[in-house]
Amino acid sequence: GYIGNTHNKAKINKLKAGTAYVIKITALNSSGIAISSRTVGCTTLYSKVKIKSSYASTGRYTFNMQTVNPSNSITGYKVVYQSSAAHKLITKYFNTRYSFTIPISGNTFYQVKIYPYLVLGNKRYVSSTSTDRYISNVITLQKAGNTNSSMSVKWNRTAGADNYSIYIKYPGSSSFKKVKTTTSNFFTLTGMKKNTKYGIKVIANKKMKNKVWHSDSKAYNMSLV
């Protein structure tokens, strides 16, 4: 395309997000004859980004972002998050394209909004479209008693959770099976055999619109001696 301009700057509209362009700038004299020319590359900001993977660790949560092409269409990420316990918005800027970590505390869901941004000159341009996630740390289980054939566990409630799913790995099985979804923070596994290990993990669930979000999980072993 061609843009006629007598000023020292021009605005090009209707470009695609996250796309590299080559722009040729030509200076013309009063007769319309080219007297100099320069070609420059530019890129537009991605409107939205994707998360490659994410995980919780002690006191923090890490997001690994999917690589964009061209990579220089993103400088970093603006991250806005709040916990279901405090309801206080926190905003952080991360000058990285690949991975970032936010601090979190246990026993609460967090709403996380991730916006890509691009720095041109001294100005930061932030996308108006966010990638949204609801995250929560792992649930820590505590033994709450046992009989000759059963064992009970309990856990602290997670702020913002609607319910909890209990998964058991029975002896001889290589995978966990969901056995119950409950609003309680207490569970008893019955029919246990002595000197036999059972796997258990509890996951907090939060429903938002048509999607259910889950906390991270940690597997524990249970056994009756």
Question: What label would you give each PLM region?
Answer:
Residues 12-32, 103-123, 189-210:
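Beta-strand-rich modules
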Residues 17, 30-47, 120-137, 207-225:
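Extracellular fibronectin type III
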Residues 27-29, 57, 67, 81-83, ...:
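Residue-level signal for short segments within beta-strands and strand-turn junctions
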